[in-house]
């Protein structure tokens, strides 16, 4: 998988079937063989290996499958269902194992990723299930403690992961294990839904608060969708009614619960659950807990001092789910903002996701944490949802919604998008297969784009915008190429009475300590930009690095707060570039001489 220098050989590492069934067979385990059909299909074409989205997916996938510090070995993953004290957080029984199984199973389903050891791991997990249906240490039915809430949390994540595996491989033993977890949850529901328990495990318990129970709704909704068993639906509905956003509580737990409510809506079609999520979205986006990066904190105010990759992934996925359910552009725009900024910034150069502290003006390097126990795996799980949202079909038209690399195959067309967006603002949509009749291709014009220039096979075409899209209908042929050129400019946004932030297209800009060391000192927040930018080209020489966004770089003159009579230059660049380099500090909110 790696060349002699240790670099990932992308062309050998992951192969993709163009949304046909995966072309790889997972190694079968006897424990899973009942009613299990092998994964097979036509040989798929190679996935574009230079796309911004796919490269980020591949970075985290490689970290999970082949990385270290720590390595996700079989023993390491199984530690939370035995449980054994091999690592941190094994009391969250099923948390790491469930996320690991779900993320890799979904990667196999969506991207066609070859994960040959997954079957054997799942078989070893399900045989560790307790007679009562749960995994882990002893559950205290009489009077649950924080340890019991942690066990519930982990079992909820494991239920979701096993069901995502079941979506990939219809294994009767796995579904039976999922039913046993569901039956355990139904058994404890009267106690867990009681006012006494809800009040006992308030926000002060944080990661072992009542969200450990409410997040069960995701697995229960999925279990109902698979089985049509009414008790699972009824319990999911009962949980939905007690979900609330408590001050200071755990954001990941709350957003996971909301994603479960969306899953309940998708499984039942009952619009009240969609309305609940829409109201929750309005509540979050109108609060101080919506960050300028498009993300959310780890804890709701007043416990909002750092971010968490799990919460960022949840926020992206919730917005994409709302977008799919409603096609309202505000949800897609919010997801886009978070994908290009908070989620990208949160991804470490190792491929991990985790925590970053934030201040009133920026994101210091101090306090950065790679949260391998949850965020890395939850971040990996987010990529398939993004990939499946790059395109969508509606009313016979194919829509290109997010300016990312992606692929879709529908009866009339098979297309893929390849991106040089970060370098020259362009996307190329290639037609791989086409039918014998005309097909409509609609391409979204995001709010940050001044215009979209479109050409087909090198010839410009003039298109008009309607409802946020430009449309092109013709009889397509294999090999046709549609090039989109997004017109972008730097925008200045007032973010406080005396401070501004800068963006270029979808990217939020910041000053990084790595290439502006003189800008950072004791009075950094008091530095003042002196004039409009001097240059829209990169002025700091650095080795070529992955995930760079040269199109967004800009340079300003500034007065150093500690010696203002000696002005200097500072380069601003996309904070998404953080993934391509060691962790460094960033300033995002600036004083200026003209505002």
Give the residues covered by each predicted segment.
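N-terminal secretory signal peptides
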Residues: 1-16, 21
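C-terminal beta-strand-rich structural cap/linker in extracellular carbohydrate-active enzymes
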Residues: 441-442, 472-487
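C-terminal beta-rich recognition modules with glycine/proline-rich loops and embedded aromatic residues
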Residues: 236, 277, 332-430, 465, ...
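Boundary at the C-terminal end of the N-terminal hydrophobic targeting segment
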Residues: 31-33
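Aromatic (Trp/Tyr) and acidic
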Residues: 35-116, 145-169, 210-231, 235, ...
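Asp-box/WD-like beta-propeller blade repeats and closely related beta-sheet repeat scaffolds
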Residues: 142-149, 181-207
């Amino acid at each position: 998988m790696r060349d002699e220098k240790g670099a990932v050989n992308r062309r050998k590492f992951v192969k993709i079937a163009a949304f046909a069934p995966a072309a790889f067979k997972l190694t079968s385990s006897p424990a899973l063989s009942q009613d299990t059909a092998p994964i097979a299909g036509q040989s798929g074409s190679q996935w574009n290996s230079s796309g911004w989205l796919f490269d980020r997916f591949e970075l985290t996938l490689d970290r999970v499958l082949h990385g270290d510090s720590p390595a996700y070995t079989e023993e390491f993953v199984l530690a939370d269902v035995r449980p054994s004290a091999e690592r941190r957080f094994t009391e969250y029984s099923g948390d790491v194992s469930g996320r690991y199984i779900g993320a890799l199973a979904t990667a196999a389903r969506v991207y066609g990723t070859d994960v040959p050891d997954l079957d054997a791991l799942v078989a070893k997990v399900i045989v560790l299930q307790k007679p009562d249906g749960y995994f882990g240490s002893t559950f205290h039915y009489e009077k649950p403690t924080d340890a019991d809430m942690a066990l519930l949390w982990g079992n909820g994540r494991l239920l979701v992961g096993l069901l995502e595996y079941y979506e990939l491989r219809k294994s009767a033993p796995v579904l039976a294990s999922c039913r046993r977890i569901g039956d355990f949850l139904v058994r404890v529901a009267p106690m867990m839904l009681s006012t006494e328990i809800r009040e006992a495990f308030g926000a002060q318990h944080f990661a072992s608060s009542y969200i450990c129970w409410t997040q069960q709704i995701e697995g229960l909704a999925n279990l109902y969708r698979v089985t049509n068993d009414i008790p699972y639906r009824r319990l999911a509905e009962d949980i939905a009614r007690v979900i609330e956003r408590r001050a200071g509580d755990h954001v990941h737990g709350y957003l996971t619960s909301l994603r479960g409510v969306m899953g309940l809506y998708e499984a039942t079609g009952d619009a009240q659950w969609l309305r609940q999520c829409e109201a929750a979205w309005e509540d979050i986006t109108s609060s101080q807990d919506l960050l300028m990066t498009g993300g959310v904190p780890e804890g709701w105010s007043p416990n909002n001092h750092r971010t968490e990759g799990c919460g960022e992934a949840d926020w992206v996925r919730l917005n994409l789910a709302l977008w799919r359910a409603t096609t309202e552009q505000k949800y897609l725009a919010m997801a886009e903002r978070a994908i290009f900024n908070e989620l990208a910034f949160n991804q470490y150069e190792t491929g991990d996701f985790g925590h970053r502290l934030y201040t009133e003006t920026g994101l210091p390097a101090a306090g950065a944490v790679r949260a391998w126990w949850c965020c890395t795996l939850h971040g990996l799980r987010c990529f398939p949802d993004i990939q499946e949202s790059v395109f969508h079909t509606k009313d016979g038209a194919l829509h290109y919604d997010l300016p990312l690399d992606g692929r879709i195959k529908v009866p009339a067309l098979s297309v893929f998008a390849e991106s040089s967006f970060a370098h020259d603002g362009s996307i190329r949509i290639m037609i791989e297969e086409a039918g014998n009749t005309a097909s409509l291709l609609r391409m979204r014009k995001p709010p940050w784009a001044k215009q979209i220039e479109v050409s087909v096979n090198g010839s410009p075409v003039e298109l008009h915008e309607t409802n946020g899209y430009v449309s092109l209908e013709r009889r397509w042929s294999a090999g046709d190429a549609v090039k989109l050129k997004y017109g972008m400019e730097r925008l200045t946004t007032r973010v406080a009475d005396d401070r501004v932030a800068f963006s270029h297209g979808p990217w939020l800009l910041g000053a990084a300590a790595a290439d502006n060391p003189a800008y950072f000192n004791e009075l950094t927040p008091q530095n003042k930009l002196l004039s409009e930018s001097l240059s829209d080209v990169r002025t700091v020489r650095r080795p070529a690095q992955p995930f760079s966004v040269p199109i967004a770089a800009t340079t300003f003159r500034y007065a150093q707060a500690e010696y203002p009579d000696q002005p200097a230059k500072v380069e601003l660049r996309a904070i998404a570039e953080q993934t391509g380099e060691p962790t460094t500090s960033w300033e995002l909110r600036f004083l200026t001489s003209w505002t």
